[in-house]
Every structure is written in C-alpha cells, then in structure tokens.
Regions:
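Active-site microenvironments in enzyme catalytic cores
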Residues: 21-231, 239, 258
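Structural motif
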Residues: 260-261, 312
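Short, well-ordered loop/turn sites that connect or cap secondary structure elements
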Residues: 256-257, 308
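A short, acidic, amphipathic alpha-helical segment used as a generic capping/interface helix at domain edges
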Residues: 244-253
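N-terminal Sec-pathway targeting helices
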Residues: 1-16
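Charged, cofactor-coupling segments
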Residues: 101-109, 195, 199, 235-236, ...
Length: 329
C-alpha cells in the first residue's frame, strides 16, 4: 500500500511539474499590443487614380497586427521597429492573372543568392521541399513625393501617400530557413519576391488633404475559393505610416525614399502559417535549428495540405478601396 501511495504522490507531482512547465511555455507577452492612434479617413475624402508604373522599391512591414504576432508566436517590443524587408519590384501582378508556385530550383536559386552554399545543404537534408505558399492581405501605400531624412525627424510630418490593396504572397519554407539568422528578414524578402507574389488593386486612393497619422479605416479581407480566411480593420494596425517610413529609413539608411516607392503595411491574423507559442519556446529550449524547424513544418502532410495549391483562387479586398484576385498554378 505504501508503494502504491508513493507512486500516486510521484505521479501527482509529475502532473504538477508538467502543468507548470506548460503554463510557463504558454505565457503571454510581457507588453500589451495596442493599435496606433489614427486619424481615420473615409473614402469620400479622396479620389481614385490609375497607376501603372513599377516602383523602384517595394518595402514590406511585418508583424503589425496583434493577431498575426500571436498566431506566429512572435516577440513584440513596443519600443522597437517592426520587421522590414525588400520585395522585388517585378513581383507585382494585377487582377485576374495567374501566380505560379515556385519550383524547388527557383527557391534554391533565390536562397543561393542570399546565402551562398546553402542550396547544397538543403539538397542533402530535404528530398522534398514544398513552397508552403501563403497569402497575406495588406493595406499598401505609395509615396507621392520623395521623402527626406529631415521629413522623418518631424513627429508631425504627414507623408503624401496614396493607398491600395495588396496580397503579399510568401513561400514560407524559405522564411523558416531564416530562423536564427542575423539577417532573418532578408529571407522573408526573398520568400515574397517571386514573379506574381505581389498582386495589387488597379487604382490608388489619394486623400484630398494629408494629415498626420491618417489612413482609410476599412475592413480588409482574404478569401480562398470563396472561404473567408482573414478579416480585420486597418485601424488595428500597430504602426502609423510615418513610423513605418522611419523604420525603413533606419533599416536602409543609404536608400532614398522615392516618389513611387511602395510600402506594404503588414497582414492581420488568419494566415496558414501559425504555431502555438509554447511550441516555439520549447523548440528554442531544446536547441532546434532552422533545418530542424523546416523538417517539422514540412513533415506533416496534413499541415502542408493547408497551404495554397494549384487551382486555388485567392481574393483580397479592402472595403471600397479595391480588390485583386489571382489563380494559383
């Protein structure tokens, strides 16, 4: 009886320890994630214009909605800049076009340009390398004038910008290979720079007047084969356009912010690529490297099947601002 009692006590202690570890791993972030203070604009306060010219630069902002930060188990520093990366300008496409899932060769070529030698390692470790194509609806804006560093130092500066809707497609397998790297967000950039990976609406909306911290406060949405996957108000963004431009300048101090440059402001929650926070923290504790993580992500056929595949129709839209739909092949 005493042995049985002791076993029961040990099992009880074990349950408590495991429970405590799980609670610790699944703890929330230390800082509350709050939306920025915006001057909300209605669409009748501006006009629509066509735009066809390719921008010289496309900048991407990451982790700019609380929902997306939480679903990807990402860290958040209220005093820090959001992730910033550059997309290839030839990734732009328009409504009704087709978007090709990148082949293994195209992905390895992109990786090799960023990190010479990595393609050999990937070939050795992975017989299969699915792209893990994912969608991201985003409010985008285009610069209507050159912006100087002096402008960005003015807290009351109201950049002259026009707004549009974009889908910021990404091959998540490449982004995972940036885990733990000093230039992690450059991997995000290459994962989002394939041909057709930036579908945009065909018009830009330009406010009649430019005020600090102003955006059109509208619902943005993603549908895949008619099913709503993302739906969020743009007023839930964590950063203002000025803060985003300041972050871009700090990341790329030698690049000029030029008229025609585009900024994609980040996506809300609802993407395919999501991971519980406790799993991410446990992976860090046991020392999983980027290749281990990619193996974990690509080994579960059910999880891989959730990503976009040939034949899918992906629509992103902004309430009154426009929409763009593409077909995956």
């Amino acid at each position: 009886m005493r042995i049985i009692k002791n076993i029961g006590i040990l099992l009880g202690v074990l349950v408590l320890v495991v429970g405590a570890i799980f609670i610790y791993l699944n703890r929330g972030l230390p800082d509350e994630i709050k939306p920025a203070n915006f001057n909300c604009l209605s669409l009748d306060e501006g006009t629509f214009m066509d735009f066809d010219n390719l921008p010289k630069n496309i900048y991407g902002i990451g982790l700019s909605y609380a929902g997306h930060i939480n679903e990807t188990a990402s860290d958040f520093d209220p005093d820090g800049d959001p992730p910033v990366f550059i997309k290839a300008n030839n990734s732009i496409t328009k409504d009704g076009n087709k978007v090709k899932i990148p082949s293994r060769k195209r992905m390895l070529d992109a990786l090799e340009q960023l990190e010479p030698g990595i393609s050999e390692t990937v070939n050795q470790k992975f017989k299969s390398l699915p792209a893990l194509l994912d969608y991201e609806v985003e409010l985008g804006f285009v610069l209507l004038e050159d912006i100087t560093s002096a402008n960005l130092k003015n807290a009351d500066y109201a950049p002259k910008i026009g707004f549009f809707i974009a889908n910021d497609f990404g091959a998540r397998s490449l982004a995972v290979l940036g885990e733990g790297q000093a230039n992690r967000y450059d991997y995000w950039g290459i994962s989002k720079s394939f041909s057709g990976f930036t579908p945009i609406s065909d018009k830009i909306w330009i406010p009649k007047g430019f005020k600090a911290n102003s955006i059109p406060c509208i619902n943005i949405e993603t549908q895949v084969n008619g099913e709503v996957r993302q739906h969020q108000l743009t007023s839930d963004l964590i950063y203002t356009p000025l803060q985003m431009l300041q972050a871009i300048h700090r990341k790329y101090p030698n690049k000029l912010l030029l008229k025609g440059d585009m900024v994609l402001t980040g996506t809300p929650g609802g993407v395919v690529m999501s991971t519980p926070r406790w799993i991410v923290r446990l992976a860090g504790m046991i020392g999983m490297d980027r290749f281990d993580k990619l193996t974990k992500v690509t080994s579960d056929k059910k999880d891989v099947a959730k990503f976009l595949k040939a034949g899918d129709k992906v629509l992103v839209k902004g309430e009154g601002l426009g929409s763009v739909e593409v077909n995956i092949y």
